[in-house]
């Protein structure tokens, strides 16, 4: 269009029709503004009608027929348009279009937001936090801590783009909180029926119930992460860090080991899809750290490393 208009303008001036040329320059500028203002219309309409092949193939974690995803893509087109026309130097835009460089995340660049987080769960769980104007106090059980953690993950994902990471170590202290809580319940139950099973039996009952709570808590994390939809129309991009030597003492380390074991067991099992078939979930990503206490066969936590290896062999996501 611009090349043709250059030729038209040149020919008008070549014939000495300077007044006509002046009017044509004004017309040309006006039409240029109109074209620039409507650069997103076609793409946005194709998104709404689900006929934008680029959007369908762009992100395997986003379903372009879902309303929330379409709204994110629509906002992304507006951001990309503003970024290319106003925010970036033209030479950067041209280099991107020509494939010389790739300018990442233009669909979020217009807004003042960041892309990744290392979430400080420890501070928010130990000292409380605020979510949408509601005070969330320190949880009184491991299961509640897991539920709050997923709410934090969802809030973070909805206010940034990109991934986030949490550490299971920050959940480990709440295993002891649940242990003491369950112990009081078991002791009260035994007292109510006039039975004294002895300390060993009580401890056994407590640990059995504690294991079940850990199972439910980890399951909450797994299923919340893959079923939550954030404001950017997808499940949170989350990585779970599993490092035994982050624990503050041996008691907490053993509790952390129980959480890690359950996380690996549930990942090995997978989640059921809409057909009831066990499949590999895309998230959370799991990072298991090797150290002296889990890297050799005679190490105390070698069983976790074996489980992690089996889990990797069966549930590695090719991304």
Name each model-derived stretch:
Residues 1-51:
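Charged, amphipathic alpha-helical regulatory modules used
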């Amino acid at each position: 269009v611009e090349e043709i208009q250059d030729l038209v303008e040149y020919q008008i001036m070549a014939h000495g029709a300077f007044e006509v040329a002046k009017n044509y320059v004004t017309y040309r500028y006006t039409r240029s503004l109109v074209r620039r203002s409507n650069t997103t219309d076609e793409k946005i309409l194709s998104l709404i009608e689900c006929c934008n092949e680029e959007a369908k193939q762009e992100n395997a974690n986003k379903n372009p027929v879902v309303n929330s995803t379409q709204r994110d893509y629509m906002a992304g087109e507006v951001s990309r348009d503003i970024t290319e026309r106003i925010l970036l130097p033209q030479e950067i835009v041209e280099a991107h279009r020509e494939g010389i460089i790739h300018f990442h995340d233009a669909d979020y660049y217009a807004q003042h937001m960041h892309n990744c987080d290392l979430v400080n769960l420890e501070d928010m769980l130990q000292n409380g936090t605020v979510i949408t104007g509601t005070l969330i106090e320190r949880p009184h059980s491991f299961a509640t801590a897991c539920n709050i953690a997923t709410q934090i993950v969802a809030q973070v994902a909805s206010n940034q783009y990109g991934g986030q990471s949490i550490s299971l170590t920050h959940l480990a202290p709440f295993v002891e909180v649940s242990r003491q809580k369950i112990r009081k319940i078991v002791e009260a139950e035994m007292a109510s029926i006039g039975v004294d099973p002895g300390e060993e039996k009580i401890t056994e009952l407590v640990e059995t119930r504690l294991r079940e709570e850990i199972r439910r808590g980890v399951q909450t994390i797994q299923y919340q992460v893959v079923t939550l939809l954030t404001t950017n129309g997808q499940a949170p991009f989350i990585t779970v860090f599993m490092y035994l030597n982050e624990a503050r003492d041996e008691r907490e380390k053993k509790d952390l080991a129980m959480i890690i074991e359950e996380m690996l067991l549930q990942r090995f099992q997978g989640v059921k899809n809409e057909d009831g078939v066990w499949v590999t979930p895309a998230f959370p990503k799991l990072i298991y750290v090797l150290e002296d206490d889990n890297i050799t066969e005679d190490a105390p936590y070698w069983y976790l490393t074996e489980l992690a290896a089996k889990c990797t062999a069966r549930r590695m996501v090719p991304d």
